[in-house]
Amino acid sequence: MRFLPLLACGAICVSGQDPYAVAGDHYHLIFENPWARASRVTYGPHETAPVHEHPPTPTAIYIYVTDGGEFRFKHMTGLPIAGLVITRPAVKAGAIRFSHSAPETHSVEYLGDAPTEYVRIELRTRPLDLPIRDVRIPARALDPGKSAVLNEFENGQIRILRVVCAPGKKCPASQNPDDPAIVTVMTGPQRGLVRWSPAREKGPLEEVRVELKSEPAEPRK
């Protein structure tokens, strides 16, 4: 990413707001519960979003449903990037990022020439065995005719799996059925659909399955 100093911000710096309220055309709440909050994020070519705030959760996962161009984030608050402009590089559909999360207040400018969509999952579970740096998983070409499960990353908090469901066949069952899961559909007419621990679908289909290994950081009521 490229970093540039943000020289001035004025009164807007202290007025972070709910993204679903101030940027509802771009941020779409799918669900939230004690384990996670999942959002669908969509931008058209060269669209912008006003200053908004993301909450302080320990970690977050980004699943890129489509290709996407560069984004420019102007950060007003947040550690350790207060006062910086960050340019996120272009991404490929199927790429995944598992990141350390922090409270952020920023505006957004999408620099791409084609629409883009990704899923943002803010994890509320205990952040066990955190990697030192963000985990970036590149897109992968998979054989749609053969059911398969690929373990892309695992630590004490999560397990990130790519799942291929062959035509007419149910998606492979989880080897850890007691772990709740967040499933994102990556192909077909339901591409971009996100579900909490859904029943097994039938192929042809590709999914990203995030299985949650640790308990919510805050006690469930």
Model segments located where?
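Sec-dependent N-terminal signal peptides
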Residues: 3-13
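Alpha-helix C-terminal capping segments
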Residues: 7, 97-98, 183, 188
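A short, N-terminal "cap"/entry segment at the start of jelly-roll beta-barrel domains
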Residues: 16-51, 73-172, 204-221
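Short glycine/proline-enriched turns and hinge-like loops at secondary-structure junctions
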Residues: 53-56, 112, 175-177, 201
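Glycine- and acidic-residue-biased ligand/ion/polar-headgroup-sensing regions
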Residues: 56-78, 173-192
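Short, solvent-exposed coil/turn segments at beta-strand boundaries
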Residues: 65-68, 113-114, 156, 187-189, ...
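Low-complexity, intrinsically disordered Gly/Pro/Thr-rich segments
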Residues: 101-107, 189-201
